Amino acid sequence: MTTNNLVLAGTITRSRRFDSPAGIAHTVLMLEHKSQRYEAEMLRNVYCQIQVVLSGERFNSVTENLKAGVEIQVEGFLNLQQSRNGQNRLVLHAENVELKT
């Protein structure tokens, strides 16, 4: 098996919760990350937005707090998701979520 693990901290910009037809609870977030990192001895501004998916009952205790403006750290794996219009994007599937505020 190859490694697929990402840890990313940021601010929630959108959040919605729904249950799948199978009855599984899902929360979908848009996470905005801003930081500065050194690359080739130069300081670089880093910015990204990524969709985060939390699935299952294990996140029920934290989902009430996952609203726009809340800072979190997410650990999980990346997966390719294709939208209805055929656009591909990377999605972070959460395995652990930690509130930062």
Swiss-Prot record:
Subunit composition and interactions: Homodimer. Interacts with PriA and DnaT. Component of the replication restart primosome. Primosome assembly occurs via a 'hand-off' mechanism. PriA binds to replication forks, subsequently PriB then DnaT bind; DnaT then displaces ssDNA to generate the helicase loading substrate.
Keyword set, alphabetical order: DNA replication, DNA-binding, Primosome
Keyword Membrane: no
Transmembrane segments: none
Protein name listed in UniProt: Replication restart protein PriB
Summary of the function given for this chain in its UniProt record: Involved in the restart of stalled replication forks, which reloads the replicative helicase on sites other than the origin of replication; the PriA-PriB pathway is the major replication restart pathway. During primosome assembly it facilitates complex formation between PriA and DnaT on DNA; stabilizes PriA on DNA. Stimulates the DNA unwinding activity of PriA helicase.
Family named by the database record: Belongs to the PriB family.
Domain of life: Bacteria
All residue ranges annotated as the SSB domain in the record: 1-101
One biological process term in Gene Ontology: DNA replication, synthesis of primer
Keyword DNA-binding carried by entry: yes
GO cellular component assignments: primosome complex
One GO MF term: single-stranded DNA binding
